[in-house]
């Protein structure tokens, strides 16, 4: 082989090696980019509360949970804005109070963690935001506003200590004037806790009480019709969505 041919062969070999190396580097970078674009785990929100969280509606004397409830409507609204990056779980249990949630003495059939005290239950949950909606059963079970205040304060303090974002909700009003006056005192306690602990509040009691003919949107003495559940979800969304946006922006 002449020197010229040897040089040409050497150059070709070097170019082949360089091209192969460049191709491998590009492939590795493509794999890295693809890996960095893997789907994020969704931001989880847990909604705790009574039957108005669960979504009970009554018709012709028959009451039961409906798919058209405030939590479902909130999920739909968040999904429309953020896609599948947000997931809301309805953990409402009929007939329960904030004290029962705190102590883990609610309906154990509601799930494997329903019988756990609040701290243990929340520590086991991956949810980043927790919605808390109570007040009606406190009235029906003759609790005092002070007892309710103590329970909700503990729920909020524990949630924050565990790195969760609590959001308090006042109950929707009740058509019975006597019961509603007592419920107003419970709503005042929820507002007090929200102010003292500096946590977000959805004041459903005040909002719904200001609606004209709001009683026509109730299916019985405590539970909204689907139309009112949708209105409640709109109020929830105004408070919850900015929290969701900030948390999504901070997620890796």
PLM features per residue range, with description:
Residues 173-252:
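Catalytic His-Asp segment of secreted/periplasmic serine-dependent ester chemistry enzymes
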Residues 44-49, 53, 87-92, 128-134, ...:
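Structural recognition of the beta-strand scaffold that forms the well-ordered cores
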Residues 3-8:
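N-terminal export leaders
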């Amino acid at each position: 082989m002449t020197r010229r041919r040897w040089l040409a062969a050497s150059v070709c070999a070097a170019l082949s090696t360089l091209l192969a190396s460049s191709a491998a580097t590009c492939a590795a970078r493509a794999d890295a980019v693809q890996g960095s674009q893997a789907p994020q785990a969704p931001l989880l929100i847990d909604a705790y509360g009574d039957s108005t969280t669960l979504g009970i509606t009554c018709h012709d004397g028959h009451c039961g949970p409906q798919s058209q409830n405030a939590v479902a409507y909130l999920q739909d609204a968040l999904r429309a804005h953020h896609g599948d990056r947000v997931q809301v779980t309805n953990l409402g249990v009929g007939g329960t109070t904030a004290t029962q949630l705190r102590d883990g003495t609610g309906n154990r059939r509601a799930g494997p963690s329903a019988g756990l005290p609040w701290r243990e239950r929340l520590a086991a949950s991956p949810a980043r935001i927790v919605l808390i909606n109570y007040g009606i059963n406190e009235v029906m079970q003759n609790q005092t506003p002070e007892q309710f205040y103590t329970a909700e304060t503990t729920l909020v303090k524990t949630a924050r200590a565990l790195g969760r974002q609590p959001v308090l909700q006042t109950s929707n009003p009740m058509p019975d004037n006597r019961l509603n006056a007592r419920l107003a005192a419970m709503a005042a306690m929820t507002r007090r806790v929200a102010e003292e602990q500096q946590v977000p509040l959805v004041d459903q009691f005040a909002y719904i009480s200001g609606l004209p003919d709001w009683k026509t949107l109730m299916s019985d003495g405590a539970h909204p019709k689907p139309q009112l559940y949708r209105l409640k979800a709109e109020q929830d969304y105004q408070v919850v969505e900015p929290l969701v946006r900030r948390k999504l922006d901070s997620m890796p």
